[in-house]
Structures are given as structure tokens and as C-alpha cells.
From Swiss-Prot:
Native source species: Xanthomonas oryzae pv. oryzae (strain MAFF 311018)
Name of the protein in question: Elongation factor P
UniProt pathway: Protein biosynthesis; polypeptide chain elongation
Assigned GO CC terms: cytoplasm
CDD domains for the chain: S1_EF-P_repeat_1 (cd04470), S1_EF-P_repeat_2 (cd05794)
Protein family (similarity comment): Belongs to the elongation factor P family.
Pfam family, one: EFP_N
Post-translational modification as stated in the protein's UniProt record: May be beta-lysylated on the epsilon-amino group of Lys-34 by the combined action of EpmA and EpmB, and then hydroxylated on the C5 position of the same residue by EpmC (if this protein is present). Lysylation is critical for the stimulatory effect of EF-P on peptide-bond formation. The lysylation moiety may extend toward the peptidyltransferase center and stabilize the terminal 3-CCA end of the tRNA. Hydroxylation of the C5 position on Lys-34 may allow additional potential stabilizing hydrogen-bond interactions with the P-tRNA.
């Protein structure tokens, strides 16, 4: 495996920590007036999502993870596994619930996703930033409700629950931001 010095560590870089891949989310190079320089960094484990902060000497090295982000298309779920296909090579991979990382509640089929592969196996799935899903269940809007007032929970066709404005009704299609899980717009 390749190693990188602390001077070359950047945000978004994927490293190995205790034989588990992680993504660096923050780095700060500190040179105190007295003593040795050091780098303070935060990283998030890709599999578990756990965030850890670590301080390392400027002379230390970190191991770069052999992790590849691949554009793939979600095909279907058989209940136990979720199946993805590379649109260029038509190669298919499957992942379990742990590898989905919560993306399963936004996918219904034929969406383009970014699948993170480690040693050829998927360990993380990033859904598209926005998805359009149909509301299967929500309370009806009451006359006098305004768009500026509160909201109500709505169950989507994938089973996800999001808060929507009071004017949105059942069987309408809405646009949802998958990064925050929030309602974005109503689709006409």
C-alpha cells in the first residue's frame, strides 16, 4: 500500500485506519511557537459512519486506502441484497443492508448512484442528490393552511418518511434532497 506524508493529506482523501477505510473530512496544520509541528484531522469511517479526530506529528505517514468510487445504476432489491450495474461494462455487484448506508430508503429502481468499492466489494452507496418519489400516505391539507406554516409527515413509496408542507397531498410526486432527507419541491 502507498503511504502519504502529513503535508500531502487533504480533505476528501481516503485512508486506512486500523485496516478500515475512512474519508478525511477536516485537516489543520498547526505550527506552535515552541515544539514540533503537527496535523490535526477528522475522518469518517466509510462503513460505520463514525467520525474520529486524530492528531499526528508532521513527520508521520498515513496509508492510502485502495478505494474506488464508481458510477453505477441501481437495478433492484431481492429483500436481502441490493443489485447495481456498471452502465459501461454491464458488470453487476450486490451489497447487503450494511453496505447501503441508509441509501435504500431513497432508491426505487434505475437511479444512478456512486458505489464505493473496497477490494472489489461495495462498502458504501451514495444515492443521487435529489430523487422524485410519490407520496403514499399523508394527512389531508385543511383549508386555511399556508405554505409558511409548519408541516406534516408523509410516507413515500420507498417507505421513507419526510416532513412536507401542509399543501402537499397524497399521490403527488415530490422532490427530496437525499443528503438532508428534506422536502425540496413538488413535481408537476
Amino acid at each position: 500500500m502507498a503511504t502519504v506524508g502529513m503535508n500531502d493529506v487533504k480533505n476528501g482523501m481516503k485512508i486506512l485506519v486500523n485496516n478500515e477505510p475512512a474519508v478525511i473530512t477536516e485537516t489543520e496544520y498547526v505550527k506552535p511557537g515552541k515544539g514540533q509541528a503537527f496535523t490535526r484531522m477528522k475522518y469518517r469511517f466509510i462503513k460505520s459512519g463514525r467520525v474520529v479526530e486524530m492528531t499526528m506529528k508532521a513527520t508521520d505517514d498515513v496509508e492510502v486506502a485502495d478505494v474506488v468510487d464508481t458510477d453505477m445504476r441501481y437495478l433492484y432489491s431481492d429483500g436481502e441484497y441490493w443489485h447495481f450495474m456498471d452502465p459501461e461494462t454491464f458488470e453487476q455487484v450486490q451489497t447487503d443492508k450494511a453496505g447501503m448506508g441508509g441509501a435504500d430508503k431513497w432508491l426505487k429502481g434505475e437511479e444512478d448512484c456512486i458505489v464505493t468499492l473496497w477490494n472489489g466489494a461495495p462498502i458504501w452507496v451514495q444515492p443521487p442528490n435529489f430523487v422524485e418519489l410519490k407520496i403514499t400516505e399523508t394527512d389531508p391539507g385543511v383549508r386555511g393552511d399556508t405554505s409558511g406554516g409548519g408541516g406534516k409527515p408523509a410516507t413515500l413509496e420507498t417507505g421513507a418518511v419526510v416532513r412536507v408542507p401542509l399543501f402537499v397531498n397524497q399521490d403527488e410526486i415530490i422532490k427530496v434532497d437525499t443528503r438532508s432527507g428534506e422536502y425540496s419541491a413538488r413535481v408537476k
